[in-house]
Amino acid sequence: MNINKIALIYNKDYKSLAIIEEIKKLYNYCEVEEAEVIIVIGGDGALLHNIHCYMHLNIPFYGVNLGSLGFLMNTLDTKNLLQNIHDSTVTILNPLLMQAKDTSGQIYTALAINEVSIFRKTNQAAKFRIDVNGIERMSELVADGALVATPAGSSAYNLSAGGPILPLESNMLCLTPICAFRPRRWHGALLLSSATIKFEIFNTTKRPVNATADFQEFNNIIQVTVSSTKDKPIKLLFNKNHTLEDRIIKEQFGG
């Protein structure tokens, strides 16, 4: 990948500003709309936020890690930055499309790169039904909530909730309960990425539920539908010696 125009996105903290000044001395940069690659300096959260902001431009993203985990990021190497981007591996992510309806009947639509989740709003456990492709698969789940995760997001909230890690090329989705109470032994399901999952929330007055698509939250939800979309592919760039697939495999062995 031959790159001449880069855009720089960063937090205005002391550490980021020092690195940005070094990068600006070495390379020319431009506005996001004119760039061939968007470089995000920070952590996974900053990268996800900016993907949501600029994914409509269909420009590849290259993350430089200044956060704590940096699962979706690359290590900092300012002197070889453009060469690393030139040699990088492209990973295509297909986000989830969430449609949520609240108690007033208003419908919200949002995209998620990691996961869509529903969760209880009070101390009362949530109660809901799960349909897959229009077929009822669980008549009632009592839990703190549930989530649907992409392969890229399977090592995040999904893993903490007890779900499996998925290889990027698996064309699967994780459906994982969050602290299931009944049925207690249900640990979730693996579904084809073509599946449509619907959550129908019960008794929302006594047991209110919120929904999230990554960091976007919606209150007092009565129904959520989740499906994968290939209409909005996201290109992430990773250093050739440390691809996202490598990271997912390493994570499964405690790395």
Swiss-Prot record:
Q: Which GO terms describe its molecular function?
A: ATP binding; metal ion binding; NAD binding; NAD+ kinase activity
Localization annotation: Cytoplasm
Chief localization = cytoplasm
Instruction: Quote the cellular component terms of the Gene Ontology held in the record.
Output: cytoplasm
Question: What GO biological process term is on the record, naming one?
Answer: NADP biosynthetic process
- One matching Pfam family, short form? NAD_kinase_C
Kinase as UniProt keyword: yes
* UniProt KW keywords: ATP-binding, Cytoplasm, Kinase, NAD, NADP, Nucleotide-binding, Transferase
Which residues are the signal sequence here? none
Give the catalytic activity: NAD(+) + ATP = ADP + NADP(+) + H(+)
Name the source's superkingdom: Bacteria
Thylakoid among keywords: no
State the active site.
44
Q: Give EC number(s), comma-separated.
A: 2.7.1.23
- Sorted alphabetically, which InterPro entries does this protein's record hold? ATP-NAD_kinase_N, ATP-NAD_kinase_PpnK-typ_C, NAD/diacylglycerol_kinase_sf, NADK
What is the required cofactor set for this protein?
Answer: a divalent metal cation
| Chain residues that bind NAD(+) | 44-45, 49, 114-115, 144, 152, 155-160, 216
Known function: Involved in the regulation of the intracellular balance of NAD and NADP, and is a key enzyme in the biosynthesis of NADP. Catalyzes specifically the phosphorylation on 2'-hydroxyl of the adenosine moiety of NAD to yield NADP.
Family, according to the entry, reads as follows: Belongs to the NAD kinase family.
The protein depicted here goes by the name NAD kinase
Q: Which organism is it from?
A: Rickettsia canadensis (strain McKiel)
Upper lineage ranks? Answer: Bacteria, Pseudomonadati, Pseudomonadota, Alphaproteobacteria, Rickettsiales
What is this protein's gene name? nadK
